[in-house]
Amino acid sequence: MPSEPKKKLDDTETQGAHAQAAHALGPDEALLHGQYRIQSYLSSGGFGVTYLAHDSLDRPIVIKECFPVLTCHRRGRSVIGRTREDAATFSTIVRNLMHEARRMARLNHPNIVGVHQVFEENGTAYMALDFIDGLDLLEIIQNDPRRLTPKVVQSILKKVLKAVAYMHDSNMLHRDISPDNILITADDEPVLIDFGAAREVTNKASKTLSSLDSVKEGY
């Protein structure tokens, strides 16, 4: 479930983002006994909320929170199931996500986002990920296509394919490869993010969510 170590947001964007994600934790919230402190909301999807944070050494970190909106809601800081049945489903999602995230943490590849830590708090699961200072490939395609010269595109494709092959050799599937899940650094280095582990687990855990594709449509 890692997702989305996106570019930093300015103060105006951050305020707007928080207004759009009322279920997100607020700025300056501490996690793991103060080891991580949230700076701002970055993004959210059907299965998680992503934050920019800093660790105890004041280094930028991305925090991904397991938050499947169809099965849970926030009460204070705690994340709980909407119904008794949802609570059982959510518990299964968290348990399996922790397992998948620990497997991801063993991956070590320059073109795959690094997992620093996996932990449980507030009744849900969290992943601490590398902060990648860059734009996702979809943003570049839409807003700066001239940057994608044939040479750059060829380099990106080769490196992404090598990263995918490395994952397959490690008996793992990404399941959600698309331009918005490939970050591009200032040096045109691609980094795979957002592994969609919770999506795979949810499909197994709940008939309610079984209509959701475990592999992104079109990719």
Regions found by a protein language model. Name each.
Residues V118:
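Activation-segment/catalytic-loop signature of the eukaryotic protein kinase fold
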Residues H54-I61, F67-T71:
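Conserved N-lobe loop of protein kinases adjacent to the ATP-binding glycine-rich P-loop
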Residues N122-D136, I140:
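Conserved short submotifs of the Hanks-type protein kinase catalytic core
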Residues R77-R106:
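AlphaC helix of the eukaryotic protein kinase fold
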Residues K162-M172:
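Protein kinase catalytic-loop region centered on the HRD/HxD motif
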Residues I156-L157:
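Activation segment signature within eukaryotic-like protein kinase domains
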Residues Q39-G45, T50:
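Protein kinase glycine-rich loop
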